[in-house]
Amino acid sequence: MIKIDNVKKFYTDKVKIGPLDIEIPKAGFTSLIGPNGAGKSTTLLMIGRLLDMDEGQIQVANMDVSESKSKDLAKVLTILRQENHFVTRLTVRQLVGFGRFPYSKGRLTKEDEVIISKYIDFLDLTNLENRYLDELSGGQRQRAYVAMVLCQETEYVLLDEPLNNLDVARSVQMMEHLRRAANEFGRTILTVMHDINFAAKYSDKICAMKDGQIAAFGTVEEVMDSTLLTDIFETRIEIIKGPYGPIAVY
């Protein structure tokens, strides 16, 4: 479980995130949605300890994020930021291998190599594993980064806008991979999403944010509400109930 207790982040006297209070259940897929500036990425970065909170406490798997040792936290939690600066002379396999660093400290074992191959195959990268990152398309490179974080084999996986710069087909492919990771590997996946309908189709829970606050948290059916989403996004949003679940029309 990810437990966020009275967490606040201050930027100026007028701009702040929180107080945030939420418990995200273990296993499954949870999406953070909301307009730009709502605090989604800030919240994700605080959970991943890439950004300090000013008040409150965050626990992941009963570990205090602020107090835990990095080497211990790295075996429980991994995070992929929206922007990643890659080394061009790095192959896909070498990149994915970085996911094993918390365990091997750079000295890959035979077991590590098996795990690396597992996630390269899982993300359909086998034919690309010896290609350099600068030879890949944006979608292929994004899959390589996701393979790297999954290769870390942490129970909790945080992803900041994993569909960034992906077209519709590649976005569907990515979401199907992440959904499978939650189902087949029992991962707890928390991701920042801009597309409401992708969040609705693939998530178990949705957390909607506005103005640094949690506006709603619940099942897809609970959050996919016309009145609620219209207020959050400040534009008219209609919800259509269909055979594949609720769809937002705006």
UniProtKB/Swiss-Prot annotation:
Gene3D superfamilies: P-loop containing nucleotide triphosphate hydrolases
Membrane topology, record value: Peripheral membrane protein
Reaction it catalyzes: a Fe(III)-siderophore(out) + ATP + H2O = a Fe(III)-siderophore(in) + ADP + phosphate + H(+)
Keyword terms of this UniProt record: ATP-binding, Cell membrane, Ion transport, Iron, Iron transport, Membrane, Nucleotide-binding, Translocase, Transport
Pfam families for this protein: ABC_tran
ABC transporter domain ranges (all copies): 2-236
Residues noted as binding ATP in the record, renumbered to the chain: 34-41
GO MF annotations, alphabetized: ATP binding; ATP hydrolysis activity
Chain's role: Part of an ABC transporter complex involved in ferric-petrobactin uptake. Probably responsible for energy coupling to the transport system.
Listed PANTHER family: IRON(3+)-HYDROXAMATE IMPORT ATP-BINDING PROTEIN FHUC, PETROBACTIN IMPORT ATP-BINDING PROTEIN YCLP
Name this protein carries in UniProt: Petrobactin import ATP-binding protein FatE
Source organism of the structure: Bacillus anthracis
UniProt lineage: Bacteria, Bacillati, Bacillota, Bacilli, Bacillales
Gene it is expressed from: fatE
